[in-house]
Amino acid sequence: MSDQIAPTLEQPLKRPARRRVNRADSFGGGLPLAVVAILVTLGGFWPTFFSRLDEVDAAHMLHGMLATGWLVLVLVQASLIGIRKPRWHRVLGWLSLPWFVLLVVTSCHMIILMMSATGGLPIPFEQAKIFGFSDVTALPLLIIAYVGAIILRKDRHVHSRLMSITLLAGLLPAVARFFYWIMVAMGLARVESVVGLDGLTEVRLEGLALAMHPTFVFVLLALAVAIFFDWKNNRLRWPFPFAFAWFAINY
């Protein structure tokens, strides 16, 4: 009997496996994505918005501040999780509700202005319909992602990735302009300054619709990288694949 027990007692005790916490995944990639989004927004809208704030009308000023503020909000939210301040994160999350509603309302207004005459100078429909289509299709994704993030807020993994998707859904205009200025530098597009009926100088971005191709490639590539790392770390859930399919179909 003792001979049978001895080997069992000599076996080392195994400790239960501890779940490894990936600190880099503090908010579904929201922290680095928000930083990139802010930089791209500043670069894309600097020539026509941030450097001309004294010439921007009230409607564009309000939307621009709300959209830029949303990027900062997600950055702060991701940072609060990173420094372990969940209470502040929740408070700021609920305060984001009226901000988001205003963002959606002004986004709809911007789409209407884009597809209509502004300052007596109508935007060519052949150009506007391509560029405007991306906003029309991205807006429902923005709403779905935010509402889903609120409803599924107790599922931290899904919640964080849905908030990251709100960044990408609202980033298309900035990314398009960012690539557009690169195309201008390469001589593939041009900028025209014309005086409207109201006497104000308007900047016309000829060929802006062509920038939508690298824009969608950029967004799809960002999502593909996010999906790969989630899959590699055995934490892949539905938000990123859903967003990838959404953008791919619309593209």
Stretch-by-stretch model annotation:
Residues S2-Y251:
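Alpha-helical membrane insertion/targeting regions
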